[in-house]
Amino acid sequence: MKGIFLTALALTAACQADKSPSALLPVGTVLAGATTTNPTERVAELYVSTEVVGFIEPCGCTSKPLGGVQRLATVLKRGRPAHALLDAGNLLFPAEPLTDTTREQHVLKARILARVYRQLGAVAINLGPSDLTLGAAFLKELQREGAVPWVSSNIRPLGEDGPAIAQSFLRDVGGIHVGVLGVATPESFAGVKGVAAIEYATAVRAEQALLRRRGAEIVVVLARVGEKGADDLARDVPEIDVIVRAPGTPIGTPPAPPKKVGSVIVLEAGSQGQHTGRLTLRFGAQVTRPIALDDAGADQAARRALADRKIRAFRTELDAWQADPTKADAVAKKRAQIAELEKQLAAPAPAPGPQPLGSVRVELVPLTEDVPPDPIVADVLAAYYAELKNLNLSKGDVRLCAKTAAAPTYVGTEACKSCHPQAYALWKTTKHGKAWATLESQNKHFD
């Protein structure tokens, strides 16, 4: 079965290798990327992920699961021919320590993520602390299996046993020279062996200057420094253009809309690979700074969502106040506030206009069930689950699960049916009634 798994990975490589206009090359090399036919207009897309932490697809615990590398592959293939993929750090492993029970499973997933990201056109993967969960030697092994473009300007390898970690990359994406560098907080690498960490703002300032001298027209920083750290970095080093900050907003809360901090665009893409950020670069023959942010209506949507939350909160207050005659004036004012907010929401939200020349449009793309899985990457995941089944079966003696006369037995739902026929009939109509069959049909009952 391991052969099937490796064959599936090889198939992905054979079908997708070298199709990206941003294939991996040594530091200092600028690619001849796909260019537009109009020399006065250059358009390219950058896709970004933040805090994937080893998730190759959603766990399936929610009614509308988000995420999955097979969906990410589809989104990228539907995008512009000139595109590249970036990650802001902590791609491979969870932030919490691995257990002996799940270690091998996480290693399998890390190998999938490294290979799939590479074949989807990843041109820079910022080094996060959890990426070094198995040590620097493991990352070097991944690079031997297939080039993995690690980047960090302030986390540097020690000795020769670790992976190659570039301080920055210069890429040609759709005729646009994109400089990419990565940083992380030194304290997040405290106790991590094989690397040395230095202060990141100084490293960014020096590296962006080098990228400019080499011809970078736009400089993107993959910064695993938190929200405040990203805002401070934008103020401290205004010479950069874009910060992709991590960690992203935890799942269950919508990712923050993009914003401008001074002249710098700051954005994130959530967590666990549930979304991808899409940056559409649209420039003329020259790039004029500061680069404008086109948020594709995200700020307007956030304002409308805030207004809706306020209405619900105000109505809750009204319910508590209306029985109190001493609060009549407050009730009237609150009703007026609700009416004004409802008036704002009644007006249709303006549709985003054409993207202006000289701007970066930032959109958050949710990887929903509506996005069909890419068949090649789906085959890789199917091989992974088959390998995982064999792996977990090999860990124990299945004979210990055999029935014995003295041991309690599992009777199943049929034993409930005779006493509770109506409840049983209702249960059979729910998703709970076919939960195990669902797991089996997707080969996930050993996950």
Give the role of each language-model region.
Residues 13, 57-59, 399, 414:
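Secreted/extracellular small peptides and ectodomain modules produced from precursors
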Residues 2-13:
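Bacterial N-terminal signal peptides
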Residues 15-390, 419:
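Acidic, metal/ion-coordinating pockets
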Residues 5-6, 115, 415-418:
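Alpha-helical interaction segments
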Residues 375-447:
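Sequence context of c-type cytochrome heme-c attachment sites
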Residues 6-8, 35, 41, 410:
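Residue-level detector of transmembrane insertion/anchoring sites
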